[in-house]
Amino acid sequence: MAKVISIANQKGGVGKTTTAVNLSACLAHLGQRVLLVDIDPQGNATSGVGIEKGDIDECIYDVLVEDVDTQDVIRTTNMENLDVLPSTIQLSGAEIELVSTISREVRLKRALDQVGRKYDFIFIDCPPSLGLLTINALTASDSVLIPVQCEYYALEGLSQLLNTVRLVQKHLNTDLAIEGVLLTMLDARTNLGIQVIDEVKKYFREKVFDTIIPRNVRLGEAPSHGEPIIRYDAKSRGAEVYLDLAKEVVANG
């Protein structure tokens, strides 16, 4: 069965989708079979792997709310070994519609169980909130990867996320683990970035990935071309660091 990893942080702009897309693509590049699950109604992970939102007939909404078979909604991408379970703005109504549904917190888990044997890794790109969609992701996951931006107030709000993780561990998924904390958007020219690294490592200790994602122009350009960085510019610093991260994730087992 696939290892299922949620990429979560309720703060926006910390590199969740960038990490979901590029970590998935780099693992696929290394020969791993990967499914990227987009449960953010903005659908940026979907477009980030080249899927046009206007071309999507069915999406993760139909799986969660309408009980459509997961396999029928999965799309191949232009990268070998990388598939996507796409999202559209239709998903924004799912949390309200699921409130009265029986076993509402395990809808995604049941959906992914249908296809788990086809993949080595499944990554879930979570929305910037701690609502029912993120709860579904954590319930379906073996672990959670937490991106933290190397900026002032980096740790703000993390206690809320960690409390949600503990509640899910207690009531819904006792095996949920912290995969690791990923430092993102580092500007090595500033003292602040170094201070944040020290602060995060002091708090999370060995749970912090060795790989740190720097600010990188090519990494920022890639989504507008609908390509992961490993396809857009394989020689860029952004591609190098996400390949390093992919190797760390494989080594974690």
From Swiss-Prot:
Its EC number is 3.6.4.-. It catalyses: ATP + H2O = ADP + phosphate + H(+). Dimerizes in the presence of ATP but not ADP; ATP-binding is required for double-stranded (ds)DNA-binding. Interacts with DnaA. This is Sporulation initiation inhibitor protein Soj. GO terms for biological process: sporulation resulting in formation of a cellular spore. The keyword Transit peptide does not apply. GO terms for molecular function: ATP binding; ATP hydrolysis activity. Mg(2+) binds at T17. ATP binds at K11, G12, G13, V14, G15, K16, T17, T18, P214, N216. Signal peptide: none annotated.
